[in-house]
């Protein structure tokens, strides 16, 4: 037997000594993998029922494909989708919905691309702990999604062209015992502002005195990520921005209004700060486990950016209600387009979601808002 430790073991010891967080992850995985599991793992997929290789389903215009329809108690652990669709805007035209325990209104409703962080309607690769987009057009979700009685997940084609090939694999843990009575259910809500209604277009740069002197203490006019009633906790958001004006879009502060408060008990210092970057993200893209800016566009009209953050360290709890918001520019002076999906867990029933905009209104387009870089003035 060799007396020296293998390079792999040495590496693991070094990482454990110098990275406590990663060491905790290793310990957690080791404990989980060495214990008997109390579930049966099941999968629902688009596999060819004949045993052939046509492992896909088509979705006709106006049609709805049910990708999951199973009884609980269970925990959905992984969703994988990929597709071929000729329509240019299919990521905005396909709508993902999830229903738990026989509810009539979905707990998840979002364009397919937006749910997976592709809020500008284009594919790009990125990875995080809970969502990723891999080569080539592979959409992955690892959000744990429990249900006590039943789960139904659908994909609806609101476009005008057929989706010829839609593939899916969904893995879930089936349990023999009921889930705890206080189990919270997964929710995701799409919102957009095309454009955000900035309060002025009479500015040249974000630091103009007119802008700097404006105050915003109560979140009036903020872009709303989500609103919820009941008990739960906010986990995070993926957001995309199409700039209608020149300059840095991210001067806005995040504000969380918990349980009906009039002043936010959680108030941030800037958009890139909330998404755990700094100083315009250094004008470069990045993608980490729980935060990132995988798309960082130029700071001008037409610039496109995508960002995300998950509150793994401390999900934001609420007992009665939550209103999660962010300014669009300082005190809401900018008029850029925002597209977002927020993710949270809460008790059922949930409050009503805002109506999903018609598909043609979900396509990202520059808007005539006036201001720097925007040639058409809008009334203010």
Which residues does each predicted region cover?
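Positively charged n-region of N-terminal signal peptides that target proteins for export
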Residues: 1-4
